Curated annotation (Swiss-Prot):
The gene is pydX. This is Epoxidase pydX. One of its GO terms (molecular function) is oxidoreductase activity. Keywords: Glycoprotein, Membrane, Oxidoreductase, Signal, Transmembrane, Transmembrane helix, Virulence. It comes from Acremonium sp. The chain crosses the membrane at residues 62-82, 89-109. Residues 1-26 form the signal peptide. One of its GO terms (cellular component) is membrane. Epoxidase; part of the gene cluster that mediates the biosynthesis of pyrrocidines, fungal natural products containing a macrocyclic para-cyclophane connected to a decahydrofluorene ring system that show potent antibiotic activities toward Gram-negative bacteria. Within the pathway, pydX functions synergistically with pydB, pydE and pydZ to form the cyclophane. It comes from the Eukaryota.
Length: 162
């Protein structure tokens, strides 16, 4: 492999890498945030969850602000670099569909923000864990409907393109 081909190979692989990060983040959210709704923690969770979520959101929002747009940008760039090669290998449609699934993640933004707002405000009072359970269900659905298919498409695209 020549040094000239290396940047193109890396470009082809990067959407698979960033979508792996997105999918891993969704899994981490589910595993970590799901702890708050365990029966043994419910009472303290109802008291502490709003402050924890508000503080935590400031710490992990950089992933949302940086990684997701990078994932979208890499998907788009791949569609415009070496288009003939992508068509010949059949990777073009996989990158396109992967990008669409990845962008579909943002279709859940209003629902996610509404549920996060309820958690931060401690709604319903005395049972905020029910709002967390609602957010967790939405997050699981979003990951299975958008993030996992995007990852599958980007990995398939990279395998075809490389």
């Amino acid at each position: 492999m020549s040094l000239i081909a290396l940047p193109l190979r890396l470009l082809r692989l990067l959407p698979a890498i960033t979508s792996t990060w997105v999918l891993a983040f969704a899994l981490d959210e589910h595993l970590i945030f799901g702890t708050w709704v365990q029966p043994s923690l419910r009472e303290s969770a109802n008291a502490n969850l709003p402050a924890w979520w508000t503080t935590g959101g400031l710490r992990w929002r950089w992933i949302l602000i940086v990684v997701y747009p990078i994932n979208y940008a890499l998907g788009v760039v791949n569609l415009f670099v070496g288009r003939d090669e992508l068509r010949a290998t059949g990777a073009m449609s996989w990158y396109t569909i992967g990008l669409l699934f990845s962008l579909a993640h943002m279709g859940y933004m209003r629902t996610a923000l509404d549920r996060i707002g309820m958690i931060e405000r401690g709604v319903p009072r005395g049972n905020v864990t029910s709002s967390m359970e609602s957010w967790l269900r939405m997050n699981r659905t979003r990951a299975l409907v958008t993030d996992l298919p995007a990852w599958i498409c980007f990995v398939t695209a990279a395998l075809k393109a490389l």
